Amino acid sequence: MASLQFHGNVDADIRYDISLDPARESNLFRLLMGLQLANGTKPSPRLPKWWPKRLEMIGKVLPKAYCSMVIFTSLHLGVLFTKTTLDVLPTGELQAITDALTMTIIYFFTGYGTIYWCLRSRRLLAYMEHMNREYRHHSLAGVTFVSSHAAFRMSRNFTVVWIMSCLLGVISWGVSPLMLGIRMLPLQCWYPFDALGPGTYTAVYATQLFGQIMVGMTFGFGGSLFVTLSLLLLGQFDVLYCSLKNLDAHTKLLGGESVNGLSSLQEELLLGDSKRELNQYVLLQEHPTDLLRLSAGRKCPDQGNAFHNALVECIRLHRFILHCSQELENLFSPYCLVKSLQITFQLCLLVFVGVSGTREVLRIVNQLQYLGLTIFELLMFTYCGELLSRHSIRSGDAFWRGAWWKHAHFIRQDILIFLVNSRRAVHVTAGKFYVMDVNRLRSVITQAFSFLTLLQKLAAKKTESEL
């Protein structure tokens, strides 16, 4: 947590503006924690306080059983589609092969994602709790401020939209036989028994529909978690930028500067739209502080100590961001490696099936949904990684925007160390092999279309041999 001086020596819960600076959120990840429980990646959840003591064992066993059921559903469908792929390989029917292979990749990755986040659930929970405890909900007390609530709101809205999009794509495929009124399964795979029989059809259909829902939940959870953490960290970078810009204003505010003098400084820092420097912040918007609210309870310490202490608070915030960024890399590096491979092959196969497959309307719609979700998912990971890399080295630029030279003799050694550390770029990698940025986006798409060209040549040769 930040010191009381960070908030103007008034109150840690003070709001710099009643309407533009919302109260601090106690839990930034409430929605994601619910999703984590729903998609079976939280085998050991904390039981609520109202949970009866006599049912404590049931509360511990049920999540583990549910996680096991989700993993078994995904992996057994992956095995069945593997058998289907092996059965259609001798036929040489590329469309049938790519169909089965696509679903094999999807279900094995769903199983991998579920197992991965189950194993990382404790570490992920500790990470979320650390961010909830240490994040700054607004910038250093000064004449202007930014509120990180906007980043939280963006991440929450994105999570809702992305999860709904993923579920819509997979459920529409899963319920298509019901919509058409035909007795068939949504997933055409091998079974060692008659899956359409009167005693098994309902159970098999329910299992496949549940598996489809888990595909959407697993894909949606991984992407929304990464984007949420990225947006929150970018919001913290914006809080740091505004805090560094207001170091001199913060010192004057605590030093007893008159409201008129602070208002003049506010106009100087918060220029109009025509004169304001563009792209100072990634996500957040800068607002004028309600100076009367902050001036009412301020103290008047030595200005040199106030400036130095404020810089120390900014350094602590910067270290917190770098620590969280490193933990983000540790959590997602293995996941992004497998995700990159999965997206590469899946993108290639989906495009090939879309180009060379049958022209059934429902099939085309489902393929376009999967293709759109796959491309957008790749864009999410690479674009957020690019934003983190680019904006993690802009802290020094934000420092130069304030009147730092007036207090340079108080911070000689500290500022040199800070400026050196401010050039440490944040990178999210795929297994330490590739950086997840726009270059990776281009390379994945290039690789996918290279495989697509190879498949099209194989299909053309097969057609020529048949003629």
From Swiss-Prot:
> Main subcellular localization, coarse class?
membrane
Please list the tissues where expression of this protein has been recorded.
Expressed in 15% of the 120 sensory neurons within the maxillary palp.
Q: Which GO molecular function entries does the Swiss-Prot or TrEMBL record give? A: ionotropic olfactory receptor activity; odorant binding; olfactory receptor activity
Q: Name one Pfam family in it.
A: 7tm_6
- Cytoplasmic compartment residues: 1-60, 120-159, 234-286, 356-367
Kindly list the places in or outside the cell where this protein is found, as annotated in its UniProt entry.
Answer: Cell membrane
Looking at the UniProt entry, the stretches that span the membrane are 61-81, 99-119, 160-180, 213-233, 287-307, 335-355, 368-388
- Protein family according to the UniProt entry: Belongs to the insect chemoreceptor superfamily. Heteromeric odorant receptor channel (TC 1.A.69) family. Or2a subfamily.
Q: How does it assemble?
A: Interacts with Orco. Complexes exist early in the endomembrane system in olfactory sensory neurons (OSNs), coupling these complexes to the conserved ciliary trafficking pathway.
Any remaining note in the record? The atypical heteromeric and topological design of the odorant receptors appears to be an insect-specific solution for odor recognition, making the OR/Orco complex an attractive target for the development of highly selective insect repellents to disrupt olfactory-mediated host-seeking behaviors of insect disease vectors. Odor-evoked OR currents are independent of known G-protein-coupled second messenger pathways.
The protein's name is Putative odorant receptor 85e
